[in-house]
C-alpha cells in the first residue's frame, strides 16, 4: 500500500499495460491496431499514435513480465524521487523516442513491426542513472553489485554493438532511443544534478562511441 501511494503512476502503467496486452492476445485486431508498423506510420494512413500505443502491447507473456517487473522495481523508487508527472514524461518520451529510432532505422522496411515498453523502461533506467550514478545495483546475471553508471555503460555499448546486426528480434535501436531520451529529459529537469554527475554521463556516452567504433571498424 505504501508503494502504491508513493508511486501511483508506476502502478497505473503496469496495470494498464498488463491489461491491454492480455486483451490483445485474445483479440488480434486490437493487437494489430496498437503495434508500431512502419507502413501504417509513414504510409498514407499516417497513424503516428502507434509510436506511443506500441508500448501497451507485447510479443508474449515473458516479454510482458520482464518489462513490467523491471519497470515496477525501478519505478516505485524512482517515481517517488522525481514526482509522478516527471516520471510520466520520462516514460512517455522514452516510448516515443524508441519508436522514432525504430522508424529511422527501418524506414525502408515497410513491413517492420515492433511492440513492447522496453524503450520506456530504458528511459527510466537512463534517467535514474543520470540522477544516481553511484547507486549500487546487483543484477541477476552478475554475482556482485556494480555502480549504476557502469551498468549504463555496458548496456549502451551492448545495444550499440548489436543494433544493426539483425541477429535477434530485439529492438536495440529503440532501447538506445529510449535511454538517451530519458537521460536528456532528466538532465533538463535537474541540470545541476546532471552537471555534478557529468563524468558518469560522459562515460556512458563514451561507451556508446566505443561500441559504434568497434562495430564500424572491426575486422570482418
Regions found by a protein language model. Give the residues of each.
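A detector for small-residue-rich transmembrane helices and their helix-helix packing motifs
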Residues: 1-220
Amino acid at each position: 500500500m505504501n508503494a502504491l501511494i508513493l508511486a501511483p503512476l508506476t502502478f497505473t502503467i503496469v496495470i494498464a499495460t498488463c491489461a491491454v496486452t492480455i486483451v490483445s492476445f485474445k483479440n488480434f485486431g486490437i493487437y494489430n491496431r496498437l503495434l508500431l508498423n512502419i507502413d501504417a506510420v509513414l504510409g498514407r494512413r499516417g497513424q503516428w499514435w502507434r509510436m506511443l500505443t506500441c508500448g501497451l502491447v507485447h510479443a508474449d507473456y515473458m516479454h510482458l513480465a520482464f518489462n513490467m517487473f523491471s519497470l515496477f522495481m525501478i519505478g516505485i523508487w524512482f517515481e517517488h524521487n522525481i514526482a509522478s508527472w516527471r516520471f510520466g514524461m520520462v516514460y512517455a518520451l522514452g516510448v516515443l523516442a524508441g519508436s522514432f529510432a525504430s522508424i529511422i532505422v527501418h524506414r525502408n522496411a515497410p513491413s517492420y513491426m515492433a511492440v513492447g515498453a522496453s524503450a520506456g523502461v530504458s528511459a527510466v533506467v537512463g534517467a535514474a542513472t543520470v540522477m544516481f550514478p553511484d547507486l549500487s545495483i546487483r543484477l541477476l546475471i552478475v554475482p556482485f553489485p556494480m555502480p549504476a553508471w557502469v551498468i549504463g555503460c555496458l548496456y549502451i555499448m551492448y545495444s550499440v554493438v548489436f543494433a544493426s546486426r539483425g541477429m535477434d528480434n530485439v529492438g536495440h535501436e529503440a532501447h538506445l532511443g529510449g535511454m538517451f531520451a530519458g537521460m536528456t529529459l532528466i538532465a533538463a529537469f535537474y541540470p545541476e544534478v546532471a552537471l555534478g554527475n557529468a563524468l558518469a554521463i560522459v562515460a556512458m556516452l563514451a561507451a556508446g562511441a566505443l561500441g559504434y567504433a568497434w562495430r564500424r571498424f572491426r575486422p570482418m
